[in-house]
């Protein structure tokens, strides 16, 4: 895996993503440039794996991540899927290869979708 780029290289003066956001595994485009806001929020994401293994919610292994792209409308995504509900959370996965979670969505907040910078690549 390539080293993560510094947020300053990825974030525009307006706080938006300068580059396209891609799946690390298959390269599928998740977000177009300029469509998400940089956000620092501490969120726990389970370890990366295929979608069926994510929806059972039984494995607590994962990472506490702080740097995310915040998307306020699910229709802004180019290529993202959602797991079944795990409590009041849906995890975001790549719609092509189904690896994830690359992000997180709380069902209590209809307008906040977080994509972890460490779980995606940029071009």
UniProtKB/Swiss-Prot annotation:
Organism: Homo sapiens
Protein name: Guanine nucleotide exchange factor MSS4
Every MSS4 domain range: 9-123
Function: Guanine-nucleotide-releasing protein that acts on members of the SEC4/YPT1/RAB subfamily. Stimulates GDP release from both YPT1, RAB3A and RAB10, but is less active on these proteins than on the SEC4 protein. Might play a general role in vesicular transport.
Binding site for Zn(2+): 23, 26, 94, 97
This protein's UniProt keywords: Acetylation, Guanine-nucleotide releasing factor, Metal-binding, Protein transport, Transport, Zinc
Location of N-acetylmethionine modifications: 1
Subunit (UniProt): Interacts with RAB8A.
């Amino acid at each position: 895996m390539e080293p993560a780029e510094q947020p300053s290289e990825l974030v525009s003066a307006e706080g938006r993503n300068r580059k396209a956001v891609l799946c690390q595994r298959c390269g599928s485009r998740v977000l177009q440039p300029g469509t998400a806001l940089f956000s620092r929020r501490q969120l726990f994401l389970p370890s990366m794996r295929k979608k069926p293994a994510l929806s059972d919610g039984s494995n607590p292994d994962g990472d506490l991540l702080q740097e995310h792209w915040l998307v306020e409308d699910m229709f802004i995504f180019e290529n993202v899927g959602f797991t079944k509900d795990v409590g009041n959370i849906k995890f975001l996965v790549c719609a092509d290869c189904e690896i994830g979670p690359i992000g997180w969505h709380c069902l209590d907040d209809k307008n906040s979708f977080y994509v972890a910078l460490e779980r995606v690549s940029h071009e």
